[in-house]
Amino acid sequence: MRIGHGFDVHAFGGEGPIIIGGVRIPYEKGLLAHSDGDVALHALTDALLGAAALGDIGKLFPDTDPAFKGADSRELLREAWRRIQAKGYTLGNVDVTIIAQAPKMLPHIPRMRVFIAEDLGCHMDDVNVKATTTEKLGFTGRGEGIACEAVALLMKAAK
């Protein structure tokens, strides 16, 4: 078994909506990013890549490459997952924690889980997504941005 941890953060800027966990969420602010700014999928992709010792999302999809400008993070996750499977890994489970004062994530979490399960080709029971606030402390608490942490468990596929 191999465990990976991922983290991502994006500042608010411009107009919304935002995309979190593949879900378009209406909000008056957008997130500043080279890609679509999906902190949940970026953290998850990093966790998966880390567990497989394949580096991180910035190594695979550098923000200096114009090809990834405005990229769909679901496609980045699927491509990373293809590479991880090619190394002989299967998924144990993933756990994602979104850290945001606003907007409220709870109504969108079921769809996030569906999208992540689809992209990883796994059962919904293998995907957990939750959200929390920082009780108005720090940059997320002041409404300056959104952060996310993710953990992934991989196992070597049976031969």
Curated annotation (Swiss-Prot):
Pathway: Isoprenoid biosynthesis; isopentenyl diphosphate biosynthesis via DXP pathway; isopentenyl diphosphate from 1-deoxy-D-xylulose 5-phosphate: step 4/6. Disulfide bonds: none annotated. GO terms for biological process: isopentenyl diphosphate biosynthetic process, methylerythritol 4-phosphate pathway; terpenoid biosynthetic process. Its cofactor is a divalent metal cation. Binds 1 divalent metal cation per subunit. It catalyses: 4-CDP-2-C-methyl-D-erythritol 2-phosphate = 2-C-methyl-D-erythritol 2,4-cyclic diphosphate + CMP. It is an enzyme of class 4 (lyase). GO terms for molecular function: 2-C-methyl-D-erythritol 2,4-cyclodiphosphate synthase activity; metal ion binding. The keyword Protease does not apply. A divalent metal cation binds at D8, H10, H42. Keywords: Isoprene biosynthesis, Lyase, Metal-binding. InterPro entries: MECDP_synthase, MECDP_synthase_CS, MECDP_synthase_sf. The record marks H34, T133 as: Transition state stabilizer. 4-CDP-2-C-methyl-D-erythritol 2-phosphate binds at residues 8-10, 34-35, 56-58, 61-65, 100-106, 132-135, 139, 142. Its EC number is 4.6.1.12. Signal peptide: none annotated. Homotrimer. Belongs to the IspF family. Involved in the biosynthesis of isopentenyl diphosphate (IPP) and dimethylallyl diphosphate (DMAPP), two major building blocks of isoprenoid compounds. Catalyzes the conversion of 4-diphosphocytidyl-2-C-methyl-D-erythritol 2-phosphate (CDP-ME2P) to 2-C-methyl-D-erythritol 2,4-cyclodiphosphate (ME-CPP) with a corresponding release of cytidine 5-monophosphate (CMP). NCBIfam families: ispF. This is 2-C-methyl-D-erythritol 2,4-cyclodiphosphate synthase. It comes from Salmonella choleraesuis (strain SC-B67). The lineage of its organism: Bacteria, Pseudomonadati, Pseudomonadota, Gammaproteobacteria, Enterobacterales.
